[in-house]
Amino acid sequence: MAARSLWAVQRLQRLLASGAMSESRGWLHPFSTATQRTAGEDCSSEDPPDGLGPSLAEQALRLKAVKLEKEVQDLTLRYQRAVADCENIRRRTQRCVEDAKIFGIQSFCKDLVEVADILEKTAKCCSEGAEPEDHRRTLEKVFQGLSLLEARLKSVFTKHGLEKMTPIGDKYDPHEHELICHMPAGVGVQPGTVALVRQDGYKLHGRTIRLAQVEVAVESQRRL
């Protein structure tokens, strides 16, 4: 009987102890949750660190600087190419201007050649003709004037690079000579060379502007 009473008392003590522990846990749990919740709210309400903002701004500036540097390099390359193209255009234009300056008077010189032919023939006729005594002085003056005019024209031609071609004895060249006819080769005349010049040719700075009208010597059996 006493043993049963002791067992009942011990069991009651264990039940009371377990109930007290459960109750204490119930009281502690709400306080723990509230503490955690308050700590979380406090952490979330705090401002971000001061160094975070400037770091992002600095990174953005660096990226922008790299982009601008690439653009500068690209523009510099384009500028260099443009300068090179302009220099090439300037050189080509300069060559064209020089060519125009040299050969721009080609047509003018070609027209003057006809005048030179007339003056030369007139001067030759006046010097060889037999005229009456009363006209001799006048003809002498005319001849002197024509001679001076011819000399002046030759001086102008030389100044502008106009050269007269009298290719007697030269080998026939279709780029410089206009073949009028063939004639038998005389003594000392090589076949295929110019035997007679009907009309002188002219060159302007080495470029033929008028072919010389010539007769070319050939062997007797090949006469045309």
From Swiss-Prot:
Report keywords, A-Z: Acetylation, Chaperone, Mitochondrion, Transit peptide
Which is one GO molecular function term here? protein-folding chaperone binding
- Record-linked InterPro entries: GrpE, GrpE_coiled_coil, GrpE_head
One GO BP: protein folding
- Which Pfam families does this one have? GrpE (PF01025)
* PROSITE patterns according to UniProt: GRPE (PS01071)
* Transit peptide (residue range): 1-31
UniProt keyword Chaperone present: yes
TM spans (from-to): none
Modified positions (N6-acetyllysine) are: K141
Summed up, the tissue specificity of this protein is:
Ubiquitous.
Its subcellular locations are: Mitochondrion matrix
Would you tell me the Gene Ontology cellular component terms? Answer: mitochondrial inner membrane; mitochondrial matrix; mitochondrion
Its quaternary structure? Probable component of the PAM complex at least composed of a mitochondrial HSP70 protein, GRPEL1 or GRPEL2, TIMM44, TIMM16/PAM16 and TIMM14/DNAJC19.
List the HAMAP family.
GrpE (MF_01151)
Q: What does this protein do?
A: Essential component of the PAM complex, a complex required for the translocation of transit peptide-containing proteins from the inner membrane into the mitochondrial matrix in an ATP-dependent manner. Seems to control the nucleotide-dependent binding of mitochondrial HSP70 to substrate proteins. Stimulates ATPase activity of mt-HSP70. May also serve to modulate the interconversion of oligomeric (inactive) and monomeric (active) forms of mt-HSP70.
Similarity annotation: Belongs to the GrpE family.
PANTHER family the UniProt entry points to: GRPE PROTEIN, GRPE PROTEIN HOMOLOG 2, MITOCHONDRIAL
The protein's name is: GrpE protein homolog 2, mitochondrial
Q: Which gene encodes it?
A: Grpel2
